Structure formats: structure tokens, C-alpha cells
Amino acid sequence: MVIPLVTGLLGRDGQDMPLRLADGGTVERGVLVLDKQANTFTFKDVREQPVLSINRSFSAPIKLTTNVSPDDLRLMAAHDSDPFNRWQAVQTLASTLLVGNVARLRAGQDPEADEGLLEALDAILADSSLEPAFVAEVLVPPSEADTAREIGRDVDPDAIYRARMGLRALIGLHLNKRLTDTYGRMVTPGVYSPDADSAGRRALKNVCLDLLAATGEPHMIALASKQYQSADNMTDRMAALATLNQHEGAARDAAMDDFYKRYQDDPLIVDKWFNLQASTRDPGTLDRVRALTKHAAFSLGNPNRVRALIGMFAQGNPTQFNRADGAGYDFVADHVLTIDPSNPQLASRMLSAFKSWRALEPGRRARAESALSRVYETPNLSRDVQDIAHRALVDSDRKSTRLNSSH
């Protein structure tokens, strides 16, 4: 197999070094071609120990393992001329920090910061040559789901959420002025336009707003409320509402009420309203979702509405679905059983939210297994739901004989 790797050598000043092979060969467009089991490339005129920036622009669709040090990653995050590797360096640093802070929080310790990561993000925000859409992507920390996959086992969703929220707040505090200035600069004047440049500016503006509000500062919550009220397009209004949705209080409640009143006659937008309320991480979410199942606009006979509310709760809210008391599991299991007779495809899709239960910490793992077993042992299940439950409960280490109850 031939693997083309676009490669660069970064000096300690963050600038690209010239690529000159010691054997006199040329490196066209920075591409090193791997065509053997092992390839060796020796460069000349290398003035100092470089940082290797490899697989730039994701030139080869491969999983790459490297031994880049944290300090080298910080340099790449701040200076690499290749956007993909710059983004990858930020993601790796942030992921490492989050995984470490999850462990610290679970041990009762304070989370740590990575000053080099914060400085790199500051440099990215200050770099006017970068596309706003790219900067917006870089500023978003790895998701809770990504962090859980990185941890792999004994996962505590609450600790992951606290670590991620803490990092977002830290970015918002440390880069407050830069984020505030960028927010102002990214406002798109004039009539709304869906072109790529305007869309990128809106994306960056809304990420800045979200990070600023993550600090919990009242004037930043007020800024989100102001954007919600003054928005002239759905992208900005939804972004402001999603930001407010993360912060309990009068501002969130007022915006949620207003949003429903504005758009109650548009089914697709009402789905978004249900979606947001099911995704908020505060402890009252399950009670709110239960109440919303009685709302005049909700019906178990409307699959889109069920997906928007119960589906989002199950698959898009890892802290509240995976509540330590197991109430989230029971709520979803109950609705799977209620919906299965009339819509087995929808019910099985909801049940698939349990697929990662074995990766959870022991308490949640036991409660999730109990809810799954209750579903599986219910008589007259549809084939769809029975299959999902069976596959979730049986693995290579466990014989399925105890599960072969009559249905």
C-alpha cells in the first residue's frame, strides 16, 4: 500500500523549515511517499531539533500513532501552518487535560489548567489569516462522548461534564477580552446572507458567546439574552437559546417561553424546542421531560416529537440519562415498552441508547443492566426491540442461556 504523507518540520519559532532530503531527492509539495514496510527519510540543513507535523491536510486516511510531546503539541497548536494538524494538536491537548481532570475530580482533587493550551487558543483567535469557521471549530473542546470513549471504562458522566464545563469556563475567563472583541468583530451587518463567509462569522461569534457565558457572569448571560431577542435569523436565535439553556434561571425560562410562543405553529421548530429542553444538564431535567410528555404539543403518536424529546434525553444527555439513581434508565425503558407495540423501529432506536452501558462505572452499570433486563424479559416484545436488548446484554464473556426466556 502506498501512503502519501504531507509533512512539515516546525522550528522552535513556529516557522516551517525547508524540506531538503540528504540524498538530494526532492519533496514535492511536502509529500513523503511510504511504499515499503519501513521507510527512512533523512533531511539536511536542519538548524535545530524540529517538531514533526505529519499527515497534513489529512493527506492519508489513516490512524496515525506518534510520540509528539505535550510541549511540541502546544507549539503546533499555536503555530502550525496546516489547519488540520493545528486543530488536531488542540484536540489532543484538550482531550488529555479533560481525561486527567475527570480522574482528579473523581478523586476529590481540584482540576488543573494547561497554560500552553490557553496560550495556543489565544494565538489562534489573534491570527487574522485563519478562516472564522476554522477558529470556531478549534475553540470547541472535545465532546462528552469523545471524552468517555477516550476514558474507555468505568465512566462517570457527571465527572466528564464537570471537567468539560470547567474547561469551557476557564477558556471564557482566560480569553475574556479576546473572545469579547472577536464576538463584536464577527457580527454580520446588513441583510442576512447564507454564504460561507457569513456562516463562518456567525459560527465563530456564537462559539465566543457560548464560552463567555460558560463563566456564569451575569453580564454574559445578559449578552446571550440580548442576542436572542435581537437576532434577525434562526441560526443566531437558536445559538443564543442553546447558550441560555445551559444556565438555570429567569433568563433561560423567559427565552424558552418566548421561543414557543413565537414558533408554536411550526412543527419543525417546536421539535427543536423540545430537543433543547431534553438536552439541558441540570438535575431537574428528568422532571421537566416528564412534564413535557403531558404538553399539548406532545404526542407519543408523533415519532418526530418522541425523537425530539425522549430520544434526545436518551441519546443526547449523558448526565441525566445516566443519572446515578437509575431514574433516567427507567424512564426510557418505560417508554420503549409503551411505544414498542405501535412503533417497534422507534422503540428499538431509543433502546440503543443503552449500547455503551458496560463502559459505565459499577453503580450506573448495574442500574442500566437492570433496566435493560426488565425490557428484555417483558413478554411479546417486537423482534426489533428484543434484538437490541439481547445484543446489549450478551457479550463474549457471558453465556446467553439465562436470557433465553420465552417471548
Which ranges hold each PLM region?
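Short proline/glycine- and polar residue-rich coil/turn motifs
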Residues: D23-N39
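Short intrinsically disordered coil segments
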Residues: R20-T26, S57-F58
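Short coil-to-beta strand junction motifs in C2/discoidin
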Residues: M1-L5
